[in-house]
């Protein structure tokens, strides 16, 4: 860290400030996302949800976090101590690292690299390692089964996500996420690529281990899944990582299909609203869909999950990629 100040001086300080300015709001937004999820679930189930800590219960998540920090991290007998403790840290670190290439507005991105989508795919595919490490190092059959399920599930649906992204790239001609947003000035990709938008969102549910695809932590079958043996802040890091990944996948959905920071129509007064506000509103919409699905759709069986990924999404995505490429070539619509 000292070399940063020596070699780069003020630019080094700016880099650190940018990282903190991104990480702190994400961590705080996780707390409010948990509160919002519990409130929405309460309304859907005809009850109040959190309502005691702070006005309207808005401080409930912070109270839960303080309680969790005070809990002891118990390491099971026979567990691999180093890997057991490294797994939640790896999961949380990867969930935050992926945000480096997400554009919040025009020019508002930490690293505007030309291979931003490849970077996101690479980072998101590493997330399975933290879960496998947790399952194996816990020395528990329930945690191990949860880790195996997660590995199969995430690998299966990353294939579909990759094919969906290829379809978007065919329409854009660039791997830069800012270019993807700029290409949607005329029409959001969610309209012409509606089936791929649906596949991407459902695959995002599976990628983040959210209902109805929360089999790696299926409480009715595996106690708590891969984090059965975790407690205290080690469990808290897994919890933070899961919700940070939810926000990340919502941001990716917004960038790839909902026009990122662009307004629905480029007319007044919609274009008076700053781009980052539109981006945050679209993320909130996607997060509401996450919660809505959790409240209304029952958990899939494992064979149904695999069948959906390999026998439905994979062939359909392949056909749609070929169809999109054919239409672009036939009508000479390939991006220049």
Curated annotation (Swiss-Prot):
Top EC class for this record: translocase
Gene name of the record: nuoH
Residues passing through the membrane, by range: 14-34, 82-102, 115-135, 161-181, 186-206, 247-267, 273-293, 312-332
Protein name as catalogued: NADH-quinone oxidoreductase subunit H
Cysteines paired by S-S bonds: none
Role summary: NDH-1 shuttles electrons from NADH, via FMN and iron-sulfur (Fe-S) centers, to quinones in the respiratory chain. The immediate electron acceptor for the enzyme in this species is believed to be ubiquinone. Couples the redox reaction to proton translocation (for every two electrons transferred, four hydrogen ions are translocated across the cytoplasmic membrane), and thus conserves the redox energy in a proton gradient. This subunit may bind ubiquinone.
Its EC number(s): 7.1.1.-
GO CC terms: plasma membrane
A Gene Ontology molecular function term of the record: quinone binding
GO annotation, biological process: aerobic respiration
Keywords: Cell inner membrane, Cell membrane, Membrane, NAD, Quinone, Translocase, Transmembrane, Transmembrane helix, Ubiquinone
Coiled coil: none
Organism: Rhodospirillum centenum (strain ATCC 51521 / SW)
HAMAP family: NDH1_NuoH (MF_01350)
Reaction catalysis annotation: a quinone + NADH + 5 H(+)(in) = a quinol + NAD(+) + 4 H(+)(out)
PROSITE patterns on file: COMPLEX1_ND1_1, COMPLEX1_ND1_2
Keyword Kinase among record annotations: no
